């Protein structure tokens, strides 16, 4: 159908659907500063080939969705200053997007920040989430999921000026946080960086998203109340969200499956796709089996 925009939860959200409109709805939620195209086009088509109606979107403050306002101060979140918006607000965006599309409930997969949003969606709107796949994310617990200090300069450094500097910075960053056990596809990453730049770079928006993360409370107790099929996927070599975050998430959600991937960092290289696609499909099928049993 191509990209569309809608007023969602008082925010202009850009979204796209891929696959059979009558297919199983699958909402894909991307991470920090990542537009919907970070869900690779080919990956989305492969998921559509499994019978899913794939829905991807730019989170607020990212890509072609609305840039928000408000000053975000990272240290302020640790001093309990209220953020410009919260993970709950971002989760509500997703719920209202489903409303806009006429979808009562969906299978939901989120990556990194997207995993946190997806968890929050399941907590706040449990009737909207048929199954949950949380990828390279964490619970918000203060003792798990912390980044390796060596990658922080790549994330918190000075913003690159201009297109080529941005592309170079993206390549350098993903060489640091990416998957050492899988080939680094420079051409694919460069193409993605170009497309991301063309959608618009919102450095202030990324900081506001980051403050939404650091301001959030530990979700572990609320995750324990979930009663949906869940899969947690995490790379054993993730330097940005330590694998302890994935383990904690799987411990918190009753009956969750934990998939730890050797050599996977904080990205989704093509070599991980088969396991990811199978995992999403398998978890969705568990939801169908549970619904039929009840």
Q: Where do the PLM segments sit?
A:
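Conserved HGGG/HGGXW glycine-rich cap/lid loop of the alpha/beta-hydrolase fold
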Residues: 11-77
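Conserved acidic catalytic loop of the alpha/beta-hydrolase fold
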Residues: 88-106
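Flexible "cap/lid" loop of the alpha/beta hydrolase fold
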Residues: 123, 132-161
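Conserved alpha/beta-hydrolase catalytic His-Asp/Glu region
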Residues: 164-207
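Active-site nucleophile elbow and catalytic-triad environment of alpha/beta-hydrolase enzymes
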Residues: 206-222
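Short beta-strand/loop motif that positions the catalytic acidic residue
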Residues: 226, 232-234
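Acidic catalytic loop of the alpha/beta-hydrolase fold
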Residues: 237-241
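Catalytic active-site module of serine/aspartate enzymes centered on a nucleophile-bearing elbow/loop
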Residues: 256-294
